[in-house]
From Swiss-Prot:
One of its GO terms (cellular component) is cytoplasm. This is Nucleoside triphosphate pyrophosphatase. Its cofactor is a divalent metal cation. It comes from Synechococcus sp. (strain JA-3-3Ab) (Cyanobacteria bacterium Yellowstone A-Prime). GO terms for molecular function: nucleoside triphosphate diphosphatase activity. It catalyses: a ribonucleoside 5'-triphosphate + H2O = a ribonucleoside 5'-phosphate + diphosphate + H(+); a 2'-deoxyribonucleoside 5'-triphosphate + H2O = a 2'-deoxyribonucleoside 5'-phosphate + diphosphate + H(+). InterPro entries: ITPase-like_fam (IPR029001), Maf-like (IPR003697). The keyword Phosphoprotein does not apply. Its main location: cytoplasm. Keywords: Cytoplasm, Hydrolase, Nucleotide metabolism. It comes from the Bacteria. The active site is at D71. Gene3D superfamilies: 3.90.950.10. Its EC number is 3.6.1.9.
Length: 197
């Protein structure tokens, strides 16, 4: 039987993905200091960060649960782009992204406290960016939306205007690849569709 699911994330987008799939869960942010983990490799970075977030929350559980940890970055032009520090950085990055193709990596960590098992995987989606004008970029940044997003854009929000197309899992760009999560849960011997019963 599928244990209760705990999402170790403050991300509203990740919550919305699980809610849309009708997967019951509760939220318990990890508050892990992400600056403790550095890597020039986006795959290694998102996997380590996702695992650290999940482990921080799993250590606090008193009942058997499945803890989901996740972290996303945009890799563009050989540079890892997380959330921008401020509006000026967001504008600079969005200008840099014009007409480019980036890769959005999301690390997925799953800890089963019942079986004491841990899985860590990642998903990658290619993102083809439009060429917004300077005025469009300034207006978008003024909404505040890009300040809370890896790579400075929210494909499920206003930022969708600036994405021409993607190759890969759409949910991954939002914050969780539900197909990957389903496979990981199956690897632990459960079915995510049990949550619908």
């Amino acid at each position: 039987m599928l244990p209760p699911i705990v999402l170790a994330s403050q991300s509203p987008a990740r919550r919305q993905l699980l809610e849309a799939a009708r997967i019951p869960f509760r939220v318990q942010p990890s508050y892990f200091d992400e600056s403790q983990i550095q890597s020039p490799d986006p795959v290694e970075l998102v996997q380590k960060l996702a695992a650290a977030k999940a482990e921080a929350v799993a250590a606090q559980q008193r009942e058997p649960v499945l803890v989901i940890g996740a972290d996303s970055v945009l890799y563009l032009g050989g540079e890892i782009l997380g959330k921008p520090a401020n509006a000026l950085e967001a504008e600079r990055r969005l200008r840099q992204m014009r007409g480019e193709v980036g890769e959005l990596y999301t690390g997925h960590a799953l800890i089963d406290t019942r079986q004491n098992r841990r899985l860590v995987h990642y998903a990658v989606t290619r993102v083809f960016f439009a060429k917004p004008s300077d005025e469009e970029i300034r207006t978008y940044v003024a909404t505040g939306e890009p300040l809370n997003c890896a790579g400075c854009f929210a494909i499920d929000g206003r930022g969708s205007l600036f994405v021409e197309r993607i190759e890969g899992c759409p949910g991954n760009v939002i914050g969780l690849s539900l197909p990957l999560l389903r496979r990981m849960i199956q690897e632990l011997g459960y079915s995510l569709t049990e949550a619908w019963n």
